[in-house]
């Protein structure tokens, strides 16, 4: 498969201004994280390092990986220096990996930015030790027809549509009009986790009139 596109490179400056260091899902993630003090943790699609820094503050030994050199530049500029940032495509075999297993992996609101889900999850199971955990979040896949989500869906399409999309009508100040997203049905996501050798332990839908996000914790079998 061709290398994944680094869609955020063009928008790194804008994205940093737009989201800053706001932690919209940090609290929800924290409820799923096991104890991380002293644990090697890989933050997948780490962007400007928001989750990586949170994990480091909890005492984890953190590495962050991202395809966007521009976003990694933002992460390195903030620090701290004891976080290792890696410029790599997570959908490919992790040639950058030194072979020492990670105890956990995180991926905050990024799997819908990555075209090759199976390749990404293969990286997760490759670098995790047996029993290692994977905590991740995505935009909730189940509500494209809701009032909240309708304007962000491709014209004439619905839940069964799977693929990459952008919408010129959805939140002109937001991220999806710029970088788009890959929609997958809930069954596609759950089956991909299972097929990768990741056993689901817990799912969370943060409270909202219409669930906006889906989070989970899995373990490598």
Predicted regions and their residues:
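Conserved class I S-adenosyl-L-methionine
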Residues: 1-37, 50-54, 71-74, 92, 133-168, ...
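Class I SAM-dependent methyltransferase SAM/SAH-binding core
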Residues: 42-44, 48-93
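A short acidic, Gly/Pro-enriched loop at the edge of an enzyme's catalytic core
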Residues: 95-105
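A short SAM/SAH-binding and catalytic strip from SAM-dependent methyltransferases
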Residues: 103-117
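A short glycine-rich, Lys/Arg-flanked "PGG" loop and its adjoining helix->strand segment in the class I
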Residues: 118-133
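Short alpha-helix
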Residues: 179-203
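Core SAM-dependent methyltransferase catalytic element
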Residues: 196-198, 209-221
